[in-house]
Amino acid sequence: MEGYSSDTIFREVSGLTLRTTEDRWPSILRLVAHQMRNPTSLIAGYAEMLASDEIQRDVGRREQILGEIRQSLRELNRLAVELQEGSRAEAGRLPMRRGPMAVSSLIKETLLSAAPLCAYRKARLALSTRAGPIGGHVVGDRFYLKLCLVNLIDNAAKYGKAGGQIRVGTEARGRSIELRVADDGGGLGPNAAELFAPFAQGADTREGLGLGLTLVKAIVEAHRGSMTWKSGKGSYVGFTLPWSPN
């Protein structure tokens, strides 16, 4: 499969207009700081799990959790390193390490990483029973694509039905594959497209979701994909990516 050329990650998306370096830098800082919340939430969730008597008795599970904590710390470190690359950050760019990856492994890693985050938010995470074939390959940066999915799962956990279920599914669409996250909450509302604008929030304003969705949109478009969503009953948010079924 062909790789893609380097693309801009932080750029003018959903009305985010940055005219000068001075204007751009605070917005980049807010975007990156927002992304640091997910790994820290994961670590908090794992810490609670480690404190349980059941995990204390299960050596194998305890080692697995410690491994996930290390992975979350590595993700935090990568974000910090990229933030330190001042010249790239000031230009609104971040490096992407592209390569082919199996869709099944991307989904599996995402579910494993997001499980403690959902437990922390009292939500149930599962692979959709109506999911299409989770086969084939996409080309991209594994770290950033997983970050996109975890962002969508985190938003579903925040704004979905309390104690509800979050379902991750896929659907093949010709030479593209759609990856989507559904919940059983109240839907996205009539102005769903506006949620991809910076600093937008859902009806529940306890935590902002606009920064996360803005970054998800930018990353997806850098992979030559597009955002997808459905509001109302059975609502979901997802994205498509170029896909090879082989």
Question: Which residue stretches match the model-derived regions?
Answer:
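Short alpha-helical segment of the dimerization/phosphotransfer core of two-component systems
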Residues: Q71-L76
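Conserved micro-motifs of the catalytic ATP-binding
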Residues: A91-M96, H137-G140
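Short conserved segments within the C-terminal catalytic ATPase subdomain
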Residues: L117-S128
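Short conserved segment of the HATPase_c
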Residues: L188-F199
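Short alpha-helical Gxxx[C/S/T] motif in the catalytic ATP-binding
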Residues: G212, V216
